[in-house]
C-alpha cells in the first residue's frame, strides 16, 4: 500500500491576497522544488501526489481577463517534468547546515518542520537543522543522468562538488538550467511575467 499525498501546496490559506500574483515568489518556487524532491526520494512509498490548486487561488497558474500568468512555482514543475528520469538513484549531501525555525501544525498541534528560509540563521525555538543543499538524482536506461539541485540559503550562493561513486569521469554535462533571482520574494506578474523563469546556466566544470 502506497501513500497518496492529496491536495498539497507550500502555502497555507492566504486570507489577504490569495489571488495576488505577488503573493507567490521565488521562496514559493524553492519550497515547491524541495517538496517535489521529497516525493522523488520517497517514490517507493508515495504513489500519488496531487498539487492543489493548479489554476488560480494559490496555484501555479493564474488566469486574468487579459491572459494568464505562470507564477514562480510553475517553472519548477516545467523543469522537473522535462528533466527527471525514470529511475531514482540515492544521493548524499555532505556539508553546511542551516538552522531554520519550525511551526506547530494548525490542525494537529504537533510540530511540523515547515521551512522558513527568510528566518534561517536566526536560532529560535523550536528549530531544526537542514542541509543547505537539496539534491535528487534520477536517470534513464540510455545512461542519461539528471541532477536536481536546490540552494536553500536565502541570501548566499553556494559552490558544490559532485562526486559519482561508480562512474567517475564517465559523464559530461550536456545541459544545465537554473531558476534564479536576486530577490527571494521576486514574483511573476502580468507586468513582469518572466521575473522567475528557467534560464540556461553555466555547465559544471569537470575535474580529474
Name these PLM-found stretches.
Residues 1, 68, 98-99, 171, ...:
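Intrinsic structural disorder
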Residues 104-130, 142, 150-208:
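C-terminal beta-sandwich/jelly-roll accessory domains of carbohydrate-active enzymes
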Amino acid at each position: 500500500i502506497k501513500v497518496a499525498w492529496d491536495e498539497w501546496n507550500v502555502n497555507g490559506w492566504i486570507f489577504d491576497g490569495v489571488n495576488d500574483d505577488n503573493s507567490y515568489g521565488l521562496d514559493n518556487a524553492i519550497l515547491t522544488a524541495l517538496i517535489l524532491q521529497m516525493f522523488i526520494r520517497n517514490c517507493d512509498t508515495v504513489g500519488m501526489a496531487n498539487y492543489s490548486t493548479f489554476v488560480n487561488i494559490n496555484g501555479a497558474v493564474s488566469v486574468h481577463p487579459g491572459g494568464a500568468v505562470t507564477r514562480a512555482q510553475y517553472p519548477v514543475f516545467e523543469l522537473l517534468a522535462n528533466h527527471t528520469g525514470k529511475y531514482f538513484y540515492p544521493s548524499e549531501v555532505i556539508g553546511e547546515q542551516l538552522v531554520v525555525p519550525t511551526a506547530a501544525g494548525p490542525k494537529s498541534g504537533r510540530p511540523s518542520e515547515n521551512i522558513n528560509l527568510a528566518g534561517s540563521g536566526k536560532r529560535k525555538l523550536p528549530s531544526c537543522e537542514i542541509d543547505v543543499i537539496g539534491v535528487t538524482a534520477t536517470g534513464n536506461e540510455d545512461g542519461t543522468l539528471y541532477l536536481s539541485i536546490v540552494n536553500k540559503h536565502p541570501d548566499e550562493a553556494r559552490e558544490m562538488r559532485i562526486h559519482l561513486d561508480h562512474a567517475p569521469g564517465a559523464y559530461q554535462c550536456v545541459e544545465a538550467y537554473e531558476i534564479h533571482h536576486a530577490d527571494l520574494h521576486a514574483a511573476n506578474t502580468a507586468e513582469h511575467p518572466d521575473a522567475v523563469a528557467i534560464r540556461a546556466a553555466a555547465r559544471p566544470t569537470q575535474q580529474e
